[in-house]
């Protein structure tokens, strides 16, 4: 499968999952608004979701896929099957133990970690504990799903692993439709949603398990043993978990601080869902394009080529995220109004969530740049530097959130996350440059300036059209009118940005092609290419 086809498969599925996520959040906004029940559910769901991001997705895929692919090359499918069974036995046992411990300690976790601000409200606190207890086993399903997804990617079976995440949103949407159709109250709706999370985890695991069986591997449960391969997996996964989970760590810190104000957690969640769309889709593109190219160049000793690929990846990220950041800043209220403003979600909620989204947009280029810069360390087997910079960013985020929340409330938490993201990105960039892994290019600096100019011109067009079409975008218009006008405005803005960028030299067709295409590698190296996918 060519790189472009892999991008379409994985990136398209990611986009589909984000779209279904929007639908889910829209229904949740209508059913729960930003009231206390929304706060309770999101607080309870954030904890298993954090563990999923830290251990199931980024860390496990970064550690397991290279070792599994290496085992395929060295010992064939039989060796890979043996390795996967070793990992499965240990992973299943560890996850079962973690789940039992967390279930027993859930009241303490809610009081001190998940939502300290709920401690003074006995009813709110008790419900958060019970909902979190229902949803936490989702971690177990998702971790095993991540392992089998890594196997599928190494075997070049991308579809099942790519579509599995969609089932979470589909099942939760079904639960919301059921609740709304039968007129369930917010409490009952929260229970429906909690059980739907657990059901979705089982379905996702079933999808990838069937995919692995179809790919020719049947996994058996072995007695857990910490073999050398398993130990190596753990050594790789721990720093990757800490580094890759910086966004989720920042969100949990923000949630803990925001729990002191009713509605703050839900408002941050609604804004984060939209912000994650460009972050997730572009991040997938960077993962597919950059990592295999960079690893292959370094392995073959082409140091200058590796530096060039790193620079082109930065250019590619800025090309996509700078205009997205401007659009999120200027259109935040209109986007929130179209997606969420109905039912229990009113105009005041739109203003609040829109302001949070605008600030999140400022951090968008930084968080995608992090995804483009970290492979420069991982490809050179340096996992400690990104982990150290992540720790610094988390500390700064915590301090700023505490300082800004009394002044700016939810907006202060969003601003702290954006600042921490930029600090992390700058540290990664400067370190790569000082080590000689990034080569300064005046052409890159000039193109970055031209992309900023193009984004500014696009922003001017957005401001002008938003003012002219304000009556059509306002709360008094029908949903169909608002959606159509907003869609047209975004299309015009995109056209203006691309035209200006091409005309003034901000980007060229060749750059896009270099980032989206590569020659098909020889079979011997094909499995290694999966490491970065």
Curated annotation (Swiss-Prot):
One of its GO terms (cellular component) is plasma membrane. The chain crosses the membrane at residues 25-45, 90-110, 131-151, 158-178, 192-212, 233-253, 274-294, 316-336, 350-370, 389-409, 412-432, 449-469, 484-504. It is found in: Cell inner membrane. The keyword DNA-binding does not apply. Keywords: Cell inner membrane, Cell membrane, Cell shape, Cell wall biogenesis/degradation, Membrane, Peptidoglycan synthesis, Transmembrane, Transmembrane helix, Transport. One of its GO terms (molecular function) is lipid-linked peptidoglycan transporter activity. It is a multi-pass membrane protein. It holds the Pfam family MurJ. One of its GO terms (biological process) is cell wall organization. It comes from the Bacteria. Involved in peptidoglycan biosynthesis. Transports lipid-linked peptidoglycan precursors from the inner to the outer leaflet of the cytoplasmic membrane. PANTHER family: LIPID II FLIPPASE MURJ (PTHR47019:SF1). Belongs to the MurJ/MviN family. This is Probable lipid II flippase MurJ. It comes from Rhizobium tropici.
């Amino acid at each position: 499968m060519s790189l472009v086809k892999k991008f379409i498969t994985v990136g398209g599925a990611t986009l589909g999952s984000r779209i279904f996520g929007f639908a889910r959040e829209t229904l949740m906004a209508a059913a729960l608004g930003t009231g206390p029940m929304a706060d309770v559910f999101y607080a309870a769901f954030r904890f298993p979701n954090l563990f999923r991001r830290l251990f199931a997705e980024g860390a496990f895929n970064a550690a397991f896929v290279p070792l599994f692919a290496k085992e395929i090359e060295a010992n064939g499918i039989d060796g890979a099957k043996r390795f996967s069974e070793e990992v499965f036995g240990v992973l299943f046992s560890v996850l079962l133990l973690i789940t039992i411990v967390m279930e027993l300690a859930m009241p303490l976790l809610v009081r001190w970690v998940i939502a300290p601000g709920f401690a003074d409200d006995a009813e709110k606190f008790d419900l958060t504990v019970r909902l979190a207890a229902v949803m936490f086993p989702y971690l177990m399903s998702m971790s095993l799903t991540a392992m089998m997804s890594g196997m599928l990617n190494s075997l070049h079976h991308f579809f099942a692993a790519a579509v599995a995440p969609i089932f979470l949103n589909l099942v939760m949407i079904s639960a919301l439709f059921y609740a709304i159709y039968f007129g369930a109250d917010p409490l009952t709706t929260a229970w429906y949603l909690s059980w739907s999370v657990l059901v979705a985890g089982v379905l996702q695991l079933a999808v990838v398990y069937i995919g692995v069986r179809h790919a020719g591997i049947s996994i058996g449960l072995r007695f857990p043993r910490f073999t050398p391969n398993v130990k190596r997996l753990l050594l790789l996964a721990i720093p990757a978990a800490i580094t890759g989970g910086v966004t989720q760590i920042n969100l949990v810190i923000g949630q803990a601080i925001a729990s002191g104000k009713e509605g703050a957690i839900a408002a941050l969640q609604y804004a984060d869902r939209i912000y994650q769309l460009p972050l997730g889709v572009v991040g997938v593109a960077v993962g597919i394009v950059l990592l295999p190219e960079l690893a292959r160049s370094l392995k073959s000793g082409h140091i200058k080529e590796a530096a060039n690929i790193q620079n082109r990846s930065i250019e590619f990220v800025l090309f996509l995220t700078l205009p997205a950041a401007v659009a999120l800043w200027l259109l935040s209220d209109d986007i929130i109004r179209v997606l969420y403003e109905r039912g229990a979600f009113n105009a005041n909620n739109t203003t609040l969530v829109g302001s949070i989204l605008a600030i999140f947009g400022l951090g968008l280029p930084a968080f995608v740049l992090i995804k483009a810069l970290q492979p420069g360390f991982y490809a050179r087997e340096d996992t400690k530097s990104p982990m150290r910079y992540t720790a610094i960013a988390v500390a700064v985020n915590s301090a700023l959130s505490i300082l800004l929340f009394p002044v700016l409330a939810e907006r202060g938490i969003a601003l702290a996350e954006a600042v921490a993201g930029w600090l992390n990105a700058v540290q990664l960039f400067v370190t790569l440059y000082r080590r000689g892994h990034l080569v300064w290019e005046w052409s890159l600096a000039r193109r970055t300036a031209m992309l900023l100019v193009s984004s500014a011109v696009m922003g001017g067009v957005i401001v002008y059209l938003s003012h002219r079409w304000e009556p059509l975008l306002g709360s008094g218009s029908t949903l169909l009118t608002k959606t159509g006008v907003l869609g047209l405005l975004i299309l015009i803005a995109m056209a203006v940005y691309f035209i200006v960028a091409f005309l003034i030299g901000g980007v060229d067709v060749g750059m896009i092609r270099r980032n989206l295409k590569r020659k098909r590698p020889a079979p011997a190296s094909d499995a290694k290419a999966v490491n970065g996918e």
